[in-house]
Amino acid sequence: KAAIRSASYKGKLYGYPVSFSMPVMVYNKQYASTVESYEQLKQISDNYVVTEENAGVAKVFDFDPSGMFLNYPYIGRYMNIGGDEAEDAASFTIDEQHFKQAVKEYAQLKDTFGIDRQSSTLDECLDEFTQNKLLYKIVSTDNLKKIDESGVSYGIIPVPYLSEGLESVPMSVTTLAIVNPYTSNIAVAKTVARAISYDYAEDIQSLSGHTSARADLTKKGKNADNTDYNMLHDIYSDSIVKAKYVGVQNIYTQYEILIHQVWDGKSVDDAYNEFHKGVESYLTSIR
């Protein structure tokens, strides 16, 4: 579903979905197992016992709280940018009650897991995970190739929900192969687009590090079960499509400012009011 929505505009399909990026959680299969919620993750952290076998593990959970994309799943479910097809610049709705609740729960991850926004960078966390020093981490699907090549035994699961009554839904970004209607040879252009998006789709991850948007492939990881990779398309299909109109980055920037503010101690109400005011100001300017 997400692939078709990303490749369409006003009901017309404009491109061939080639690959996608979205946040997921990875876990170290040698020392950990699947989780569905951050409450489960907290229980693991609170009751973690260091043994001779796991002595090299430095942290149970860490992630980069600074970027909009990796942090969208926690709160983004409670606002709709661009309408049902993510293309209407005048459309913006927000579920204030659940949005604020999600922001509050999100900010609590800082103290629950001792995460520093300045030092917990994506690269640092990736290095720790690939060295068996970190049990759980939020990554982009674009990071899976590096993890797979590291030799660590890992699993892939959806981003956990923050607490009962809240959902975590990732944002996805789809890369398309688009045929220019004014090209001198439409047939050749379509053949190339099909080759990239379909015929050679199984080679995309090994060559580029991106995950193919073709859903019927059996994904393969050297150090993860194929079922973990195949599950990616189920998550992707129901993901939030990044809005595709010019200027929408203004809203995403406001969102990133919001998560920085609450992470750094600003009250949820004040951060929300500033966010909402900024979005409304932008929407007023384009109406």
Segments from the language model and where they lie:
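Extracytoplasmic/periplasmic substrate-recognition and gating elements
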Residues: D148-G209, I257
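Paired acidic/hydrophobic, glycine-rich loop segments that form the ligand-binding mouth/hinge
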Residues: L135-S140, G155
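Glycine-centered hinge/linker elements that transmit conformational signals in sensory
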Residues: A89-S119
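Long, aromatic- and glycine/proline-rich binding clefts that accommodate carbohydrate-like moieties
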Residues: I157, Q205-Q261
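Short helix-initiation/N-cap motifs at beta->coil->alpha
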Residues: D116-T130
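Short glycine- and hydrophobic/aromatic-rich loop-to-beta-strand nucleating segment
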Residues: P23-Y27, A177-V179
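Beta->alpha turn/N-cap motifs
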Residues: L122, I138-K145, T175
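Hinge/lid segment of periplasmic solute-binding proteins
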Residues: K1-V24, E39-K42, E53, I156-P160
